[in-house]
Amino acid sequence: MSGALASFSAADLGGFAIAAALERAGVAPGEVEHVIMGQVLMAGQGQVPSRQAAVKAGIPMSVPSVNVNKVCLSGLNAIYLANQMIAAGEADIVVAGGMESMTNAPYIADGARAGFRD
């Protein structure tokens, strides 16, 4: 039960979305000043998935990156934080959004550590 995007991590999908958004907006990756990405299921995704997505989109490693991790509205909260940065004059171009790959989320079977016995 896997779809066409099953082989892509959340960071891969985030990178695709960031690259497409930058292209559509006519913004070069080097113009981005900050990246804020929400993601709920970060277990097993490696370090700083927001940075991974940014780099996959061609944004330089020198650009700061932050993850927002909460059960609901991580992506929306990332957008809110980006809006605050822009409104406060801290940045002009901030990439913000959410990313997830439910197909690649860890599968956890509670009680499996001790084994399942009758």
Segments predicted by a language model, with ranges:
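Flexible glycine-/small-residue-enriched beta->alpha junction loops
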Residues: 87, 92-118
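Short catalytic helix/loop segments, enriched in acidic residues and glycine
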Residues: 2-23, 116-117
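Phosphate/pyrophosphate-binding loops at sites that engage ATP/ADP/AMP, CoA/4′-phosphopantetheine
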Residues: 19-33
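Glycine-rich, flexible loop/turn motifs
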Residues: 1-4, 59-64, 103-104, 112
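Short, mixed-charge, low-aromatic patches
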Residues: 4-13, 34-41, 102-105
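Conserved catalytic cysteine-centered active-site region
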Residues: 8-9, 36-93
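Short, glycine/charged-enriched secondary-structure capping and boundary segments
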Residues: 3-6, 49-52, 108-112
